[in-house]
């Protein structure tokens, strides 16, 4: 038995927000009350700390199989636990891609060994070829939770329509990475800084929001659910809002980096600040925050994208891979740039990091209730935290190293077990 005493218990599902005790047994929460005494229970003193549902991240890259020099499922799960996450959804752009039942089963076997809940999508098209759909039905039955070709946009509108129709038939959805290659230059650099500082043609805003406009309208026509991944532009928020206003089933996520920083970070952090989509303008940063506040964007997801130090430290920054490690800084960035900045209440933030992402996939997660799962994150929302280069992840490609942020995870509890302790 585990007894959590005197914490500020916050549950976005029920709206519970009060100082009380939580008793855990056999992977479940068995009691939430103002005062619980339990002889012999292991006790955590959570005085002054927030006791929240375990965080849920629906967009991570754990690089297994095929790229385990960057990360693997085990180190990814450790990074998740250190960041307060108890449930994550891996993307399928591995080597080989997760496009068939055999590869999926091997990945899920590896995931099952971890102390947190590690789930995965499968690809929309076979080996990312953009032309032939995978066997959605067989992959769902084998344990995939959804479908995404994240990393590579789907250029064929015909395939997008077919994928949406198939997903709708099976009561699932597809998640899309929106960057039209035909409208884009060098990825990872926003068009403004690319032109002015790097003297190259960079990643354009129109490549994101034009492709999104196509796909949300196909979703509208097919009455299918589409989830837009890591949007970054002011116009993109408007596109989602427009589609939702029409009655289309469109959901969207934003990554912490896109509401925290702008393209200028490339000048001080170099390749660690290079990502797809890129960091944008201050007007875009403000717009995605407004999208979170209005409810147009319902989910915060990291797009945790670890890379080996040698891959990032190349002479020509345009040759460095895009992406940053995100699981261990997500909560702190969100507390700093949303809650401390007065943009969202702590409860509103937690909803976008726990209940909403869990609800999207119908996971039994993201809430605190008696008889519910004992997936719990305990953190100090006010603590100052200096981000150093020591991560649980294999990778340290974070542009936030050296920054002081708000918020420190103290305990992560999954299935009733302490899986991380600061």
Swiss-Prot record:
- So where's the catalytic machinery, residue-wise? 303
Query: Transcription regulation among the record's keywords?
Result: no
Enumerate the residues binding substrate: 61-63, 93, 276, 307
Per UniProt, the keywords (alphabetical) are:
Hydrolase, Metal-binding, Pyrimidine biosynthesis, Zinc
Q: By its UniProt entry, which Gene3D superfamilies does this protein fall under?
A: Metal-dependent hydrolases (3.20.20.140)
Q: In which pathway does it act?
A: Pyrimidine metabolism; UMP biosynthesis via de novo pathway; (S)-dihydroorotate from bicarbonate: step 3/3
Annotated residues for binding of Zn(2+) 2: 150, 177, 230
Q: State the InterPro entries in the record.
A: Amidohydro-rel (IPR006680), DHOase (IPR004722), DHOase/Allantoinase_Hydrolase (IPR050138), Dihydroorotase_CS (IPR002195), Metal-dep_hydrolase_composite (IPR011059), Metal_Hydrolase (IPR032466)
For whether the record's keyword set contains Hydrolase, the answer is: yes
Q: Which cofactor does it need?
A: Zn(2+)
Q: Which SUPFAM superfamilies match?
A: Composite domain of metallo-dependent hydrolases, Metallo-dependent hydrolases
GO molecular function annotations of the record: allantoinase activity; dihydroorotase activity; zinc ion binding
Q: Which reaction does it catalyse?
A: (S)-dihydroorotate + H2O = N-carbamoyl-L-aspartate + H(+)
What's this chain's function? Catalyzes the reversible cyclization of carbamoyl aspartate to dihydroorotate.
State the family it belongs to: Belongs to the metallo-dependent hydrolases superfamily. DHOase family. Class I DHOase subfamily.
> Which protein is depicted?
Dihydroorotase
Q: Which gene encodes it?
A: pyrC
